[in-house]
């Protein structure tokens, strides 16, 4: 009998498929997100150099930071950091998460800062 995948295992498998496609097709840096129940994290990664350029998270906030408002604030911070590093085009990797809620708020906040993807 086939073993059923949990929701998180299915998301991880989807993330690997997406990441492999992105690596093959583009030379742009990749922003990917991770969300836990209480926090939200984002990293800018250069696949050519195999190096993390920028890493941000909401875990250092004293107030609850697992909501849409915190993700939006993090998106504005990430957009501002990308401007200072003169990066205006990226590839957004949502890590297998649905484009809704915190992921959507983060992406739209980065677009408001002028980042194109």
Swiss-Prot record:
InterPro entries: Ribosomal_uL18_bac-type (IPR004389), Ribosomal_uL18_bac/euk (IPR005484)
Membrane spanning residue stretches: none
MF (Gene Ontology): 5S rRNA binding; structural constituent of ribosome
GO cellular component: cytoplasm; ribonucleoprotein complex; ribosome
Keywords carried by this UniProt record: Ribonucleoprotein, Ribosomal protein, RNA-binding, rRNA-binding
NCBIfam families per the UniProt record, alphabetical: L18_bact
Subunit architecture: Part of the 50S ribosomal subunit; part of the 5S rRNA/L5/L18/L25 subcomplex. Contacts the 5S and 23S rRNAs.
Role of this protein: This is one of the proteins that bind and probably mediate the attachment of the 5S RNA into the large ribosomal subunit, where it forms part of the central protuberance.
Listed name of the protein: Large ribosomal subunit protein uL18
GO biological process: translation
Coiled-coil residue spans: none
Sequence similarity: Belongs to the universal ribosomal protein uL18 family.
């Amino acid at each position: 009998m086939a073993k059923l995948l949990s929701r998180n295992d299915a998301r991880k498998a989807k993330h690997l498929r997406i990441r492999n496609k992105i690596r093959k097709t583009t030379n742009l840096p990749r922003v990917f997100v991770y969300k836990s129940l209480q926090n939200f994290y984002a990293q800018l990664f250069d696949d050519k150099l195999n190096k993390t350029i920028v890493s941000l998270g909401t875990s250092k906030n004293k107030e609850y930071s697992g909501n849409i408002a915190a993700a939006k604030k993090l998106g504005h911070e990430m957009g501002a950091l990308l401007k200072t590093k003169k990066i205006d085009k990226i590839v957004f990797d949502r890590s297998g998460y649905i484009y809704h809620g915190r992921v959507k708020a983060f992406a739209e906040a980065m677009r408001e800062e002028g980042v194109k993807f």
